[in-house]
Amino acid sequence: MRNLSTWPTFAALLWSAPRVLAQCGLPSTYSWTSTGPLAEPKDGWASLKDFTAVPYNGQYLVYATYHDTGTSWGSMNFGLFSNWSDMATASQNAMTQSTVAPTLFYFEPKDVWILAYQWGPTAFSYLTSSDPTDANGWSSPQPLFSGSISDSDTGVIDQTVIGDSTTMYLFFAGDNGRIYRASMPIDQFPGDFGTESEIILSDERNNLFEAVQVYTVSGQSKDTYLMIVEAIGAQGRYFRSFTADSLGGSWTPQAATESAPFAGKANSGATWTDDISHGDLVRSTPDQTMSIDPCNLQLLYQGRDPSLNPGYDLLPYRPGLLTLK
């Protein structure tokens, strides 16, 4: 790969247009079209899930969790591909380190790639790299968060990390109807968010379950942030959305019901899956701002054939892509 010391300049050229030209706001209601399954797990694997994706040199770079056909979870990336239709033939590369439910981004202030995850040495951990395409080129684990939460069967789960000009924020769930937040000054990142967090959203367990993601909405007249959270509904998994004008502020429900969700069976257009589950909005930049272009909203998600129910670990999740109508 080329020298990443040139990355900030390259990124500024490559992604300046979407930031400047985005003149769309977030819709008040969402309606999508969906692909079918974009890829099948390679031999020996039963599922592909928990997707995190960034634009990289004009292509897509995706990391994910897999489960084998036995009893083990693992982590992987896909080889680079230019179009989502090419995901089916991209290489599937197992990692020697386990980075379940990953979050991938480029931390521009320190010129380093970050892969954050759960089930590591601490509650949340992270790895660093200068070449994110190499599934096994990452550093040893470092602590990202060392705290715990109460009233949760799983403990902390499904982190995401995002920054503004001064502060880095950690958001996470607990499969318990709550969303949590921690923060640190941006000049101290990458590092440990510590042990303390605050509850920023609270509801019934199924309404705020897991898979929280937070994004900067590009091209707006004022700072706008979008949060999506996976919920459990009568018709399957779906995403609710919330908005805020600061990452450290309060969050307002936007498309937050199963009948009118951010994305779910009611509006996905998908015919192969009832679940619209853990994934990532397609970002316009790879950096810590987690920026999305509201003129071109797409959601990379995990779906599955609802007629197949072999038990949670072996549920046959596959990647799919929603595109806003």
UniProtKB/Swiss-Prot annotation:
CDD domains per UniProt: GH62 (cd08987)
Highest taxon listed in the record's lineage: Eukaryota
Keywords of the record: Carbohydrate metabolism, Glycoprotein, Glycosidase, Hydrolase, Polysaccharide degradation, Secreted, Signal, Xylan degradation
Primary location class: secreted
Glycosylation sites: N83
Catalytic reaction annotation: Hydrolysis of terminal non-reducing alpha-L-arabinofuranoside residues in alpha-L-arabinosides
pH-activity profile: Optimum pH is 5.4.
EC annotation from Swiss-Prot or TrEMBL: 3.2.1.55
Signal peptide from the UniProt entry: 1-22
Temperature dependence per UniProt: Optimum temperature is 47 degrees Celsius.
InterPro entries membership: GH62_arabinosidase, Glyco_hydro_beta-prop_sf
Any Gene Ontology CC annotation: extracellular region
GO biological process: arabinose metabolic process; L-arabinose metabolic process; pectin catabolic process; xylan catabolic process
Its job: Alpha-L-arabinofuranosidase involved in the hydrolysis of xylan, a major structural heterogeneous polysaccharide found in plant biomass representing the second most abundant polysaccharide in the biosphere, after cellulose. Releases L-arabinose from arabinoxylan.
Protein name as catalogued: Alpha-L-arabinofuranosidase axhA-2
Organism this protein belongs to: Emericella nidulans (strain FGSC A4 / ATCC 38163 / CBS 112.46 / NRRL 194 / M139)
